[in-house]
């Protein structure tokens, strides 16, 4: 029986050496050490041996079993290590290869235009001022020469929270807050979000404006025209035509609408400019003395001008965008063009 056990060990180790998968090793383990395995069958015959043979053969059986279990563990480990090495080799990273760049986004056209406007006026000495979007009636209307029941309030469809609290309809309240906080000279622009009850292809209930204010001794309408002409030439090009037309705003006197030569036809007349050759881009004027009264400035000593423009309109003209709603739809196919 000893010879039979040694032959069984040699055969098992030989087959084990040929196994190439963990499943194959497991099958051999069952074949030799399972409940119906070959070594188990031999062990069942120990009872037929003489008392003298039984301990000797039992020791041989234990030795064979121990070597088989050790062999199965070793071969299984070798196979697992080989599989791991093969997988690591297949997944090897060549550190000399160029990396993959993460896709980068781009700035929204509204942001681009706002930053460009701020940069142009910043070079002219204007600081950026900010204020709350939820405003009081005083800052949004009354201090801007728009008392209650003034007919000019109908020019702006306003979102009200109550009698005196509202969503600001322009960024002019920032000018009032700034003048109340500091004495002249003042030179600021106020970019920000504003709200009005209006929505179509060229209007949105939420949009963006940049308004500007300059107050000091000796400021004239000529200063207003010079600064706005310089601003327009830097934004749209030095060859663009500029004109000022008389207009009305409750908080400036005199007031003007500022037009530029149509960016599509260059002043020749087309569908975009309604054959006039001109496009309105902003409103401006000399600050009304009544506004100075509300903020405590001496209108006999100081003069100044204010202006305001819609950023969406500037963006539409600058980038040739036909429908304002494209600026708010978050369509990446559109936004990636900027």
Swiss-Prot record:
Its main location: cytoplasm. CDD domains: PheRS_alpha_core (cd00496). It is found in: Cytoplasm. Binds 2 magnesium ions per tetramer. Its EC number is 6.1.1.20. It catalyses: tRNA(Phe) + L-phenylalanine + ATP = L-phenylalanyl-tRNA(Phe) + AMP + diphosphate + H(+). GO terms for molecular function: ATP binding; magnesium ion binding; phenylalanine-tRNA ligase activity; tRNA binding. InterPro entries: aa-tRNA-synth_II, aa-tRNA-synth_II/BPL/LPL, Phe-tRNA-synth_IIc_asu, Phe-tRNA_ligase_II_N, Phe_tRNA_ligase_alpha1_bac, Phenylalanyl-tRNA_Synthase, tRNA-bd_arm. This is Phenylalanine--tRNA ligase alpha subunit. It comes from Geobacter sp. (strain M21). The gene is pheS.
